[in-house]
Amino acid sequence: LPYKLYNDFGVRRYGFHGTSHFYVAGQTAKMLSLPVEESNFISAHLGNGCSVCAIKNGKSVDTSMGLTPLEGLVMGTRCGDIDPGLFNFLTTQLDYTAQQIDDLLNQKSGLLGISELSNDCRTIEEAAIAGNSQAMLALNMFCYRLAKQIAAYMVPLQKVLTQLAFLGINLDPQANLDARFGQAGLISAANSTSKAVVMPTNEEWVIALDAANITKEL
């Protein structure tokens, strides 16, 4: 986009989920006994809203969300990355208003829009197991976009999970199953050249800590 939009209106990529990625990076460094300021991570925040963050030497260097939380991964109800030309098609061919487009992309797309069932992965997984093809499509698209984003973020980290095995990441199936329902765990196999960790986030803790630090300075 023209640089003028940044200069005059502050149009830029902001990114979101910063407190979550900050917390997860710090806790993962502790788990692996690594100094966070010398460590590189790719953090994936996966909830109804989803984002991936490339963390180099303990600091964010790239994130999948942009000016708004709409950019990036397929999410619960958000579409993630799309062709910007879609906006012209929706307005000229289907007479959509700007508000209708915003509602479509933010509230009616993603896992909900693809599966036409739910924005909740648990419901979609149950339907996929039962043979629902749209539920399976939604899960496949979600996982594909996530794996592609993780692979892309090896570039800013100057390096490169089952789909990423060629990158040196091998999973321990049992450890992967154990690291569910809020449990932290190292899920990479012993022979994996890179480590993969499941780390539950705690955004509230980071916000509370920041608030406490700010009030100390008042």
Regions found by a protein language model. Name each.
Residues 16-19, 23, 50, 81-85, ...:
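Conserved active-site and cofactor/substrate-binding residues in soluble primary-metabolism enzymes
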Residues 91-117, 121-124:
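Oxyanion-binding "anion nests"
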Residues 110-114, 121-156:
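Adenine-nucleotide phosphate-binding core of ATP-dependent small-molecule kinases
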Residues 161-205:
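Conserved phosphate-binding/catalytic loops in two-lobed NTP-binding clefts
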Residues 2-10, 128-134, 191:
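Gly-rich Lys/Arg/Thr-decorated short loops/hinges at beta-loop-alpha junctions or inter-strand turns
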Residues 1-93:
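Glycine-rich phosphate-binding loop of actin/hexokinase-like ATP-binding domains
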Residues 46-48, 157-162:
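Glycine-rich beta-strand-to-loop/alpha-helix junction loops that act as flexible
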